[in-house]
Regions:
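C-terminal cap of metal-dependent C-N hydrolases
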Residues: 79-114
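His/Asp/Glu-enriched, well-ordered alpha-helical/loop segment
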Residues: 1, 5-89
Length: 114
């Protein structure tokens, strides 16, 4: 039997582009724990591969996602006074070959892949 959620029945990766092109603020999410958070950047990669603007895809996993969750006063952009939770990638996280090499939580390095 099909285990898909009914609300996702017609979702494809070009849905992000179609909504974004119509001026809708799109947040790319993973529905963790159903699809783990580790796949968030892969979802952004797939959205770009299917036509979404790369800058909009990056915002969809950062600032727009924070805005849509009403927490953009704390996270989503790099600004003085916001939480210092940062992931450092080898390239844009919207590119398949990109790897997360460092993670900071509250300004403290918690992961450093060297």
């Amino acid at each position: 039997s099909d285990r898909s959620k009914p609300e996702l029945k017609n979702l494809t990766f070009d849905t992000y582009k179609n909504l974004s092109d119509r001026g809708i603020d799109v947040a790319i999410i993973t529905d963790h724990p159903e699809i783990t958070i580790e796949n968030l950047s892969l979802c952004a990669v797939m959205a770009v591969k299917n036509g979404m603007d790369e800058e909009k895809a990056l915002k969809a996993i950062t600032s727009t996602a924070a805005k849509n969750c009403w927490i953009d006063d704390r996270v989503g952009t790099l600004e003085v006074g916001k939480d210092a939770d940062i992931a450092v990638f080898t390239d844009l996280p919207t590119r398949f070959e990109s790897e997360c090499v460092m993670t900071f939580i509250d300004g403290k390095c918690v992961t450093d892949i060297k």
